[in-house]
């Protein structure tokens, strides 16, 4: 998620610069096509331009946008790869696609780098959680480029301290409702990937796991301990949905509705990605957050750019953040078991070299440049995408941009990954269909149904619901 966005003029300039560079004659005319999601085009284009300058003309990296939606991105890449598209070089892959692209032979293992440098570069100075998402069957097929983790966001003016467990979340919401105060727990619970992320985090935090490490066996109910973890995760989801004063629209919620529920004064607790902080500050500066009137703060005048996006100076960001702490704060994601840290499901992108690339040596070198420490700093500080390089979390510039840096680093070190399997899309779809609507969850029955449905996905049986 972005914390800061480049203006339209800057975006146009960057796109033009990238296109012009790609038409040049550097490296004997070698162009490495770099496919990334469209919603972060400005950041990825800017970093490609930086690499073109750093590479000294030996070859050129050209950013090309994939669709905004993850499913459409995957479909386009799959079609290009199965069609043997030789213009495909470097691919930005969602963290859940590694197994599928590796198993299909679409992504080259990093050990295939002709220079022999890819594995060491991907491994050194990279956080453990993101690195795990780039592996399949203990082999690296990609190098992490961006990552993300959810935190707990809460109204500091409504409680003395944030809850540390989900049982505590429900108890706090119940107390607030009884006092006539905002009491919703904002989550992502409609039938989509966000619901799978929530369930996976609860399950892993309870000591469970969807699949065995080889991705072939469903492990939700195979042992007494695993069944207990699955049932506990489902009990929490049902409790959040049915708590006194719960969000009546909870079965239709996603990241956006969760953010708005807090900004509109309806939710006191929220689990969501770090983008909610800059969003809260931006809307408060615009006068859209009644309990945080930053539009009345003179030192924030001019912090909105020509298109109405919050683009503060460092001093303005600090002033806005300090003011917000009176009513809005963040804390580690709530755990399931008392005294134990949550294992939060991470998001992000990994860079892989396509099997169809005609310039493998240059493609692997491009990845090393795109994720070097300086370009990672730019991606994080200017682009608002959390870094995968461990050393950046000690960087004062990064820390100023990410006040939550210590929590983010800790959670990314002990992160949960989504089930690793070449048929992840089928598994994910069956999980979300079985869980929705969460108001109808019967923990024991739903645990058994999840096991049946996910095994069907693994076995390739039947149509996806």
Label every model-predicted segment.
Residues 95-149, 161, 167-170, 317-332:
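Hinge/lid segment of periplasmic solute-binding proteins
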Residues 172-173, 216-251, 333:
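Glycine-centered hinge/linker elements that transmit conformational signals in sensory
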Residues 78-80, 87-89, 119-156, 334-344, ...:
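A structural signal for short loop-to-beta-strand junctions that line the ligand-binding cleft
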Residues 390, 410-465:
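Conserved C-terminal helix/tail region of periplasmic/extracytoplasmic solute-binding proteins
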Residues 65-77, 96, 167-168, 249-263:
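Short helix-initiation/N-cap motifs at beta->coil->alpha
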Residues 275-278, 282-288, 292-319, 337, ...:
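Mature extracytoplasmic/periplasmic domains
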Residues 2-99, 116-119, 295, 299, ...:
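Conserved N-terminal structural module of periplasmic/extracytoplasmic solute-binding proteins
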Residues 111-125, 189, 208-232, 282-285, ...:
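Short, solvent-exposed loop/beta-turn-alpha elements that line the ligand-binding surface or hinge
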């Amino acid at each position: 998620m972005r914390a800061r966005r480049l203006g339209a003029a800057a975006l146009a300039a960057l796109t033009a610069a990238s296109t012009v560079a790609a038409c040049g004659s550097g490296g004997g005319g070698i162009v490495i096509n770099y496919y990334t999601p469209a919603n972060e085009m400005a950041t990825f284009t800017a970093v490609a331009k930086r690499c073109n300058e750093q590479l000294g003309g030996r070859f050129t990296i050209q950013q090309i946008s994939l669709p905004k939606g993850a499913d459409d991105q995957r479909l386009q890449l799959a079609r290009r790869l199965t069609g043997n598209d030789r213009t495909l070089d470097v691919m930005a892959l969602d963290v859940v696609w590694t197994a599928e692209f590796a198993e299909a032979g679409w992504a080259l293992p990093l050990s295939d780098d002709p220079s022999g440098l890819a594995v060491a570069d991907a491994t050194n100075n990279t956080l453990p959680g993101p690195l795990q998402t780039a592996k399949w069957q203990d082999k690296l097929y990609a190098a992490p480029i961006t990552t993300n983790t959810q935190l707990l966001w809460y109204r500091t003016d409504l409680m003395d301290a944030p809850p540390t467990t989900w049982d505590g979340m429900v108890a706090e919401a119940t107390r607030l409702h009884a006092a006539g105060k905002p009491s919703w727990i904002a989550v992502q619970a409609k039938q989509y990937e966000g619901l799978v992320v929530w369930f996976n985090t609860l399950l892993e935090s309870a000591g469970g796991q969807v699949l065995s490490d080889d991705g072939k066996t469903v492990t939700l109910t195979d042992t007494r301990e695993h069944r207990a973890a699955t049932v506990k995760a489902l009990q929490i989801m049902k409790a959040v949905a049915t708590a006194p004063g719960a969000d009546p629209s909870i079965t239709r919620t996603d990241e956006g509705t969760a953010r708005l529920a807090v900004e509109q004064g309806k939710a006191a607790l929220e689990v969501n990605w770090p983008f909610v902080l800059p969003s809260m500050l931006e809307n408060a500066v615009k006068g859209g957050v009644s309990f945080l009137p930053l539009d009345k703060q003179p030192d924030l005048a001019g912090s909105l750019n020509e298109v109405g996006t919050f683009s503060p100076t460092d001093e303005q960001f600090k002033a806005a953040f300090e003011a917000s702490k009176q009513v809005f704060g963040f804390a580690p994601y709530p755990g399931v078991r008392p005294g134990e840290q949550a294992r939060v499901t991470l998001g992000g992108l990994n860079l892989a070299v396509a099997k169809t690339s005609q310039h493998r040596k240059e493609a692997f070198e491009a990845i090393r440049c795109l994720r070097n420490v300086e370009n990672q700093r730019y991606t994080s500080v200017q682009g608002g995408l959390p870094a995968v390089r461990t050393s950046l979390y000690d960087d004062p510039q990064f820390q100023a941009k990410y006040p939550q840096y210590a929590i983010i680093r800790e959670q990314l070190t002990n992160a949960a990954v989504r089930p690793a399997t070449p048929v992840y899309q089928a598994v994910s779809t069956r999980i979300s269909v079985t869980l929705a609507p969460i108001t109808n969850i019967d923990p024991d029955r739903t645990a058994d149904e999840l096991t049946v449905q996910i095994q069907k996905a693994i076995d390739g049986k039947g149509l996806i619901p």
